[in-house]
């Protein structure tokens, strides 16, 4: 499903700030895998996610997804089939736009049958409301509220929904509960487990929480 072969990346080569972030990394995921990644800060975990998502082009090696070579594919094209959540709840949503508008953007971006000029229909809105209700956060009754008014946990739950609104081939979770309080983090992790399982999503999750890594993943990499 995901085949990463000997990828390497050096930032600022030839300068005093040169940093070898990835060095001959190999990784293989089967369809439906939930793989968790544990490691110290600066070990290159987030850089690996950046390489997969297309945030930059690797210096060498290949990345294949469902047999397609995506090594040189730009990030905006990969976003149609790769979902990603960051540690910071402020990333992944547009704070000045409403909940409905954020969901509409995510839906239109990921849906291959839509163009950027497509219009969200009443049926689409009903679908958004139904999905929001499944979060059990009351957001289905606040669709016209700006996202900037939501708590960190609510925003992260919304971002999770946006990333999976159209089922991605691969979901990248980059310590997506690290900035939340323990109770909220547990709720978001439970939502993550539910959404991933129900939609049979292949998932990679970075975490420093060993119990979460062992309970959620069918394989853990250190």
Predicted regions and their residues:
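A short, flexible loop at the N-terminus of ABC-type nucleotide-binding domains that lies
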Residues: 1, 10-24, 74
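Helix-to-loop junction immediately C-terminal to a conserved catalytic motif
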Residues: 53
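Conserved ABC transporter NBD signature motif
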Residues: 61-69
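H-loop/switch region of ABC-family ATPase nucleotide-binding domains
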Residues: 207-208
